[in-house]
A protein has these predicted regions:
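Generic N-terminal leader/targeting and pre-domain segments
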Residues: 1-20
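Non-catalytic DNA-binding core/recognition domains of DNA-processing enzymes
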Residues: 25-117
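Short, charged hinge/linker segments at domain and secondary-structure junctions
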Residues: 51-60, 118-149
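Flexible glycine-rich surface loops and low-complexity tracts that mediate binding to linear polymers
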Residues: 114, 205-231
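Beta-strand/loop nucleic-acid-binding surfaces
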Residues: 192-209
Length: 235
């Protein structure tokens, strides 16, 4: 694809997929198409946040008639700046994805970053950052999803409680995600939480310090229990 000022995000993503069609199996190609479709949704939803005032006005006018205006208006130089949002938030919070698609999200991001650089749409630094982020996501997104499932299973064993009757010292995580501070076999320690959460060994094997977990913990008879759990965000 020759680089021209008129190449849009949408056109670049289509050209990337066209190149992949020549070399990928049908099943793998479907994963690529699914990931690129999700990336488009992410770009259209969150990309405008990075626009300066004149560009944002232009986008707002176009958006009135076209919800995908961001990808139709702006060039591919905007793609890689959204990779962290896409892999770190969007794929976790907004997408019900299986292990295969979660792994593919990182792989496709790496391939796309290299392709954008080869075609003159991204600099070396942007490519390197996106490739690194993609490699980490391929490994960590499936792990984080498995950990979230294990914590959810653990929450099912916690009896219903009257939150109003709990001391503020005995309930944490209602307002903000908790960050894993350290991991020991069968134990997760969270920042600003006094004492460990005991978990199955499989869960502690998956977890990593620095990951954020949307989770509510309650302390009963000196032991932390999982009351509710949402997502695990690898960092």
């Amino acid at each position: 694809v020759p680089q021209t000022p008129t190449t849009t995000i949408d056109e670049a993503l289509e050209a990337f997929l066209a190149d992949q069609r020549e070399r990928l199996s049908a099943r793998t190609l479907r994963n690529y198409e699914d990931v690129i479709d999700l990336l488009r949704h992410c770009l259209n939803g969150y990309g405008p946040n990075a626009l300066d005032e004149p560009e944002r006005k232009r986008w707002e006018e176009a958006y009135e008639d076209d919800e995908e205006a961001f990808c139709h208006l702006f060039g591919p130089e905007y793609i890689l700046s959204e990779v962290s949002e896409f892999l770190g938030y969007f794929m976790v919070r907004k997408v019900m994805a299986g292990q295969d698609l979660l792994r593919s999200a990182g792989t496709v991001t790496k391939k796309l970053a290299n392709w954008l650089h080869e075609h003159g749409y991204a600099g070396e630094d942007a490519r390197d950052l996106a490739v690194d982020r993609g490699a980490t996501a391929s490994r960590d997104l499936p792990r984080a999803e498995r950990l979230a499932n294990l914590l959810y299973e653990q929450s099912l064993a916690t009896a219903t409680v009257n939150r109003a009757a709990l001391s503020s010292r005995d309930i944490v995580g209602q307002d903000l995600p908790l960050q894993i501070e350290r991991v020991e076999p069968g134990k997760l320690y969270f920042i600003d939480v006094d004492g460990p959460l005991r978990v199955p060994r499989e869960a502690s094997d998956l977890a990593k310090p620095g990951w954020d977990v949307t989770i509510t913990l309650i302390r009963q008879r000196g032991t932390w229990k999982v009351l509710e759990v949402g997502n695990v965000y690898p960092r």
